[in-house]
Each structure stands twice: as structure tokens, then as C-alpha cells.
Amino acid sequence: MASVTLRGITHRYYEGSGSVTAVEDIDLGIEDGEFVVLVGPSGCGKSTTLEILSGLSQPTEGNVFFGDKDVTNQPARKRDIAMVFQNYALYPHMTVEENMTFPLKQRGDVTGREAARAVEDAASMMGIDEKLDRLPGDLSGGQRQRVALGRAIVRDPEVFLMDEPLSNLDAKLRREMRVELQELHAALETTTIYVTHNQEEAMTMADKIVILRQGEIQQVGPPQRVYENPANRFVADFMGEPSMNFFRGRIIDGDPPSFDFEGQRTDPIPLSNGSVRPDQEVTFSIRPEHIDPVNSEDGDIVGEAALIEPMGSHFEAHVTLDSGDNVIAMLDPDTRLREGDRLGLRFDRARVHLFDTATGARVD
């Protein structure tokens, strides 16, 4: 096992007559045994970062360290890593056992008996020990992914690199495999760097998440801390389903200062934040689960229930405000509310977030 460090990593490639920056000035430290998830929308640079870590791509600038060793110019075959891909990358003409044994044969420093024992142990760990004589085409998607993971395990690498390994699975199987991956990491304690666009995977699996946008790191930290304290509007909007509600307005001077909603006929909301400036244009944000339905006269904002979506444990109320803006509130299933009803919405003041309207930076 090893710690992993990226220092000043930038990667550019040429397209047409110009260059495109895929990632820029990435600084990231990953501790030995940590499970880190790189998450972000398509094209944000997460897969490029993984390719640089693997040695499949070379950075234009910067260095990659495994422990204290600079591996920037070391090819993939000489790095002590194991990769797992979303398309499994199994040899269709080889049995499960042959697929899992293949990386050990390539290394050439393992005896046949040692290889057989490693495959047996990994297959047992992944629950595929009765499938060793099967071909990949005879297996389900979940079983093929377990073979791919087992093949990575037999290498006993310093670092696991995983690129969207669950994206081809259905929702139920994805959830099951997510749990298995967490159990696997707890058992092996191998440094793992995992790429996904799925925020649920990031929230549930990671010790630390790294949120990327347009090739730059937006925020790094434990999942719950990032969720509760987003560094900017992009992170606030990206993390969470449904996403945050956003309202434009301005700060009114006072003790305490208050927020005046743009286009709303409601009273300004007092704020506990002392760092905002009078007349500063800010975006007021709150998550759907931190909104309560109240009588119209008691609401921070007022509107009409346009759509109610039952979700089992709760329902999501889509409310059209008098200003024309739309808000999503996550409400208790026992709440008595029908489409077309007028209602007020009250915010949990301790859960309010403020972002500078011009820059998107957090100001609270």
C-alpha cells in the first residue's frame, strides 16, 4: 500500500489548431489506505486524472508520487497498480480462472502454486469460486464485474484505480456491489481511487471526495462535510438529489442583517451571518429537506403546489412561487397537501447557505 500525491498536475492535448486543457494545476494528497472518489460531470477531468495516475497518460506539467517515489515518467506496467474498468476488460476466450491468473503470469515472479492460491482466495472473497471454469460470456454483468475485481485483487497492488466500475449495472445490483466494494476495502485496506459521476456512490463509499469541474478541483473533504458546507454554488448544486434551491436577492443592513428575496412580496429573512455586506447581491440557498410547509401567512416564501411526487419515505413538492420561481421541498408523507393548494414555506435558518451572485463563492 502507498500514499499518493499529485503536485501541480496539468494535462493539455491538441485539438484542431489549438490546445485543450483537460486538468489544470491539480494538487491532491491521498493517504495510505484511503478510499478517495473523484466525482464531477462528464468532461470535468476525472478520467484524465486517473489515466495520469495509472501511467496511461503523461502530464504536461507536474509530478505523481506513490509514497516518496516519483513515478511521473514510469510506464503503467511498472507501477504497482491494478485497474478496474466499467467495461470489465475480460478476455472472452479465457475462463474466469485464466482471466484472474493472467496478470500474475505477466509479472513472471509468481509460481503456479502461488498464483492458484491467490486466485482461489480472491474468487472466494468475491463469491465467484464456483464460476472459475466459466467463460465471461456465460456470466451476468454483476458476476463479470466481480471477476474484474478479483483479477485486480490477485495482483495485491499498492493502489487500486477504478473508472466507473458500476455504471453498466442496474440500480439494485449497483447498490449491492457498492456495499461489496466497501467491505472489500475494509478487508484489504488498499489505497483506492475511484472515478464516478454518481454522487450517491461518492457520498456512500468515500473517505474523501474530490469534486472536479472543467479540470479544476472545486472542493475536497469528507462527503458529509462537503454536502453540508459546499465551497461554492457549483458544489452546492451538484451534490444532492434533488439539488439545492437557489434564490437571488440582496443583503439589507441591520442587526442582524437580512436577506430580501428578489421578486418576492414576503418580509426579508434575518441572517446570523456577520460577513455579508449591505446591498451585496447574493444567492440564498437551501436544500429541499430543510424546508417545512406552513400557513401562507407564516411562510418565508409563498406559492402554489404545482406537482406532488410520492417517493415512499417522503414526497417532493414542486412549488411555484408568486415570483414565478420554482422550489422543491422534501416533505413528510403525512403532510396534507394537494396540487393547487396555496402554502407557505419556512426555512431552517441554521441550514441556509449564501453565495456571491457574481463569483459563486460561499460568503456565509
List where the protein language model places each region.
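ABC ATPase nucleotide-binding domain
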Residues: 5, 29, 65, 250, ...
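The feature captures the beta-strand-to-loop junction immediately N-terminal to the Walker
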Residues: 39-41
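Helix-to-loop junction immediately C-terminal to a conserved catalytic motif
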Residues: 54
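Conserved coupling/switch loops of ABC nucleotide-binding domains, chiefly the family-specific signature
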Residues: 60-63, 214, 248, 352
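Conserved ABC transporter NBD signature motif
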Residues: 62-70
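ABC ATPase nucleotide-binding domains
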Residues: 76-234
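Non-catalytic connector elements of ABC transporters
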Residues: 242-244, 253-364
